[in-house]
Amino acid sequence: MLAYLEVVPTLGITRMSDHHFGNVLEYNRLRKNTKLYKKFTGYTHILFHELDAFVFKDELLYWCQQNVDYIGAPWVYRTNDARCLLHKGVGNSGFSLVHVDHTIRSLEKLNLSAGRTTVAQRASLMKLGRHHKLVRTEINVDVFFSFLAENDPEFTVASFNQAVKFSFELCPAELFEYCQHELPFGCHAWGQYDRDFWIPIMNLFGLGKKQISFRKRAQKPMSPGKKIFYLKEKSIISLNGNAHSTNKESG
């Protein structure tokens, strides 16, 4: 924290109890607790930038103006077809932007501030055909914002096409092709997924190999999803059965 103050002496710091950061479970509870967001009601948005995130562009104001309440890197998974990725939703919370007031409202409405669901809520989620992790008692913060919040008509989650311009996490090389070799606003877990892709890019941003510490993480097994897009020579895609093209050739 002192390093930040050396760069920006006027930086304001809000401290939280250490127990919130002792393990993933406690951190997830914090991220779903209205008390966190009520500390920042003087602001419209919170940008969550965990230690393994990185910002490429000065676009924060732009993203705050996009009329979405939650945005993070899209969840995509490789398939047996090298041209095909399975899109499961939006998105990762390690580098994410949330609307403060709307998040408070949604948390209070769904009564999930403590990170727990009732039997009735779990049954409802099962009827919706959601992934099995959605029905466990402790709901991960990523899952909460990307799926549970979709059931609140007043809470807006970013679309895939918005999220892919906001951040990469899984399958960054494929998403880079999809975006016609344009980097997003930022990324998350760049030291864990596809290091061969990230090392040259991070070198361009001043991070030499000696400064990069990797903890390699295998990509999670693919589970059922509804949205499929196909990668071809220049990222010609088909999303949800509708053809789209990122170049002039659409063969």
Residue ranges, per PLM feature:
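Active-site-proximal specificity loops/subdomain of glycosyltransferases
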Residues: 2-44
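A short acidic, often aromatic-flanked loop/helix-cap motif at beta-alpha or helix-coil junctions
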Residues: 16-25, 78-79, 165-169
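Long amphipathic alpha-helical coiled-coil/heptad-repeat bundle
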Residues: 43, 85-86, 130-133
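Short beta-strand-to-loop acidic/aromatic patch adjacent to the donor-nucleotide binding site
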Residues: 43-55
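Short His-Asn-centered micro-motif
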Residues: 49-50, 72-74, 92
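Conserved donor-nucleotide/metal-binding helix-loop-beta segment in metal-dependent transferases, i.e.
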Residues: 54-85
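Catalytic core and acceptor-binding pocket of nucleotide-sugar-dependent glycosyltransferases
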Residues: 90-242
